[in-house]
Amino acid sequence: MSLENKVKILSDNSVYRVTDLIHQRGVRWQRDRAEILSNPKFKDTIMFDYLMEKEKEWDYDLLKSLIEKHTKKYNYPIPEENELVVHLRMGDVVGEGDSCPGFEAINDMYKGFWDNLNPDQFNKVTFVVALHFGANDLTGQYYYSDKVKEDNFTILENIKKQTEDVGKEMNIYSSSEPDKDICYMAHARHYVKSMSELSTIVSKCMVNDSDIYVTKSYK
């Protein structure tokens, strides 16, 4: 199965942007918090529970407990004991514009991906990835396009080749429900952060005493 058939595309994920909701970031976070709390389709999500239960901002202890709760409640899959879980923040970040790193920066960042990792110490390698497009109607940014989609898959194919060159299969974990991806990452015992703030949030909510690795930052 090709990567395009494995990786979910969230072409209009304008509301459920976990980092912005938690860190009160951007021009929409207040409106989107209100939408999370008022729209029934978000009622069973981690962010709904977080916004209902939090007594302070940036409450990672609460978030961690909700991740554990939702994983058990919905029987979400979790990684194996000796599985390396890699977060790839893809989607609108590969686009053009002042607020996006762009194709060249992201592609360069993932060159030499395995240079500082020993693939032989892991039985399995899983990349958690979806193409996320924030589609901000207030700024006109972060919208889906076929060109940006193609550039994303070019980068993913490059990472796949590097992974196969070190003798590992590129397993993909990708969901149209961000909660499932977050819960999978937070249960990893070996976790590679991406350059995104979501990766940092997840790293503060790890369920286990995990080894955390960091990829190179984009320039």
Regions found by a protein language model. Name each.
Residues 2-126, 132-142:
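Secretory-pathway luminal glycosyltransferase catalytic domains
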Residues 124-215:
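Donor-binding and catalytic core of enzymes assembling or modifying cell-surface/extracellular glycoconjugates
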